[in-house]
Regions:
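Extended interfacial segments that mediate partner engagement and assembly in macromolecular machines
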Residues: 2-15, 38-41, 53, 57-64, ...
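A broadly conserved sequence feature marking short terminus-proximal activation segments
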Residues: 20-70, 79
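Flanking scaffold residues of small Cys/His-coordinated metal-binding clusters
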Residues: 68-69, 84-85, 103
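Cys/His-enriched microdomains
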Residues: 72, 88, 106
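Short cysteine-rich clusters marking metal-coordination/redox-active sites
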Residues: 74-77, 90-93
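Short functional micro-motifs and their immediate structural scaffolds
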Residues: 82, 95-99
Length: 117
């Protein structure tokens, strides 16, 4: 369950950033996660609910996830195509020589905070 490590790292970054910004609380965090990261959404949500309570800044913070589906480019014919996690062969020329263009993201896109000011 690598979601625990992912959430732990995300919360550390969020809390550090929120403190530097003078936040009184974190309202919402938006993540972008590619399907190729093999993150289980239910496990991510569970870890978030548990670990966000460790700091008063994130006690009520909502987590939103934007999924990124994999897309690859064929290095033989140049075709760009969407696929699932397991089938990366080019649909145009059937080559297995492809490059993953997106789908491995694991990014904090934004966070909404409140300040006492």
């Amino acid at each position: 369950m690598h979601e625990i490590g992912i959430v732990s790292g995300i919360l550390k970054t969020v809390i550090d950033t929120a403190r530097q910004a003078g936040a009184s609380r974190v309202v919402r965090v938006l993540l972008r996660i590619g399907d190729m990261c093999e993150v289980v959404p239910e496990s991510l949500d569970f870890a978030w609910e548990v670990f966000r309570e460790d700091d008063p800044l994130t006690l009520e913070a909502a987590l939103e996830v934007e999924e990124v589906h994999p897309r690859s480019r064929c290095l033989v014919c140049g075709e760009e195509f969407a696929h699932d996690r397991f089938h990366m062969r080019c649909p145009a020329c059937d080559s297995g020589d492809t490059h993953l263009e997106c789908g491995r993201e694991l990014d904090i896109v934004s966070m909404e905070i409140e300040t006492d000011d």
